[in-house]
Amino acid sequence: VELCQRFARRNREKMAEILLDRTGLNGESPFHTVHNYIDVDEMILRKGAVSATEGERILIPINIPDGPLICIAKGNGDCNSSAPHGAGRLMSRAAAFERLTMAEYREQMTGIWSPCISPEPLDESPMAYKSIDEIVNSIGPTAEIVCRLRPIYNFKATPHNSDCAPPAALCTSDFSSNKPILKEFFDSR
């Protein structure tokens, strides 16, 4: 388990390194937030939760259009120094496929560039999750909200989305020549 978790951590770091390298941006103060895992140091299984030791910076995703919250953990012992790992579902994945429509999903994703809005990730649509207000109002015992990030791009890997790719400006090997295109891409969001 520990080896797999170390591999996953390095994988996240490598993806960030590639993104930062290609965009010419820097990662001022990177941090990791892992959910649904076994904390082998503390021997705690965190299902639906993240580590939230006092002072730890954590990221709590809400849903795609609402974006994530960056928080500072409070280390609440009554919660095993854990915090929720996200908004939580209002309905099961199966129910989401039965009840939600692509039209609703597309409408909710307005303003977020995503080449992968298709029926496959319909179960990840914002309507399947609790509202940001509910999370903001209940997170207090475990974490203090520092800020909320505004999403501009979303990619959901599915078995059939090989044609879903970011703009060419995000994929070239010589990214420096595409900075004006990238700036235009981000400024338009």
Describe these PLM feature segments.
Residues 1-189:
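Domain-length cofactor-binding catalytic modules of enzymes
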